[in-house]
Amino acid sequence: MPYYCGVDIGASAAKLVIVDADARMVAKAVRRSGVDYAATAEACLAEALAAAGLARDEIAASLSTGYGRDNVPWADGRMTEIACHGRGAWHHFRRAMTVIDIGAQDSKVMHLDDAGRRTRFKMNRKCAAGTGAFIEEIAYRLDLPLGDLNGLAERSTKDVTLGSFCTVFAATEILARIRAGEAAEDIVKGAFRSVVKRIFEMDTVDGALVMTGGVVAYNPFLVTLVEESFGAQVLVPPDPQHVGAFGAALLARERAQQGEEPC
């Protein structure tokens, strides 16, 4: 049986997925991207192959995506993050939808029709507001491990509104709030609300709302806040961090099965 590989080299994390001929995920891997994307992609591939008990020559086709997609020498082709995240999300929820992906360095809002075709998209790449980098800055300013933020936000009992989306200005405001005696959990929840507000200002929502990305995977309370703002349930794939890599693997499979050349 042939297998297909998708690798998503993000600014912070590299994700890799292997699927079989029936589009079932058989293995995955995730690592910090580091500075040598090629080496990181190679390590992810080796890890996933070992987990699936596969040999390298059993991978019939592969596609790379993400910030470092041009730095994966063994990939047969490259696809945009928009295409791969959209394809991965639509595999899980086959309906018209708006996909919000919150990454380390950018946020994306994608609109798909009920056939999975992309109708429009918007990206936030010029500012850290509404991204994982903003949340990392909050953790740094509060001197907290990044992994503690979600639990803190869940324990908040008071609404605190940060007045700025800008990471630099927000950091200054956080220091002022700490001096004023605001609780860390209330500040973190306020920061999460700031991310949510920024995302909804990027574009409108059409159809079902789906959220993907590592920020969502590690901070599920963000989804709760989005649901409060959206007024309806938010759909989250089983493994939101790997949706881009999964979509790349699915596209590699489809192109190979249709006899198309890698792009």
State where each predicted segment sits.
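A short acidic Gly-Thr/Ser loop motif
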Residues: D8-S12, Y67, I102-D106, G214-Y218
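Conserved phosphate-binding catalytic cores of ATP/NTP-utilizing and phosphoryl-transfer enzymes
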Residues: Y67-R120, F200, G247-Q257
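Active-site nucleophile and cofactor-binding loops and adjacent substrate-binding regions
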Residues: R32-S33, G77-G86, I100-A104, K122-G130, ...
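Adenine-nucleotide phosphate-binding core of ATP-dependent small-molecule kinases
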Residues: T167-T204, Q241
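N-terminal glycine/serine-rich phosphate-binding loop of ATP-dependent small-molecule kinases
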Residues: M1-E81, L225-E228, Q233-V234, E260-C263
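Glycine-rich phosphate-binding loops at beta-strand->alpha-helix junctions
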Residues: Y67, F200-E201, D206-S229, P240-G244
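Glycine-rich phosphate-binding loop plus the immediately following alpha-helix
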Residues: A115-K158, G163, L250
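Glycine-rich phosphate-binding/hydrolytic loop that grips phosphoryl groups
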Residues: I135, P237-C263
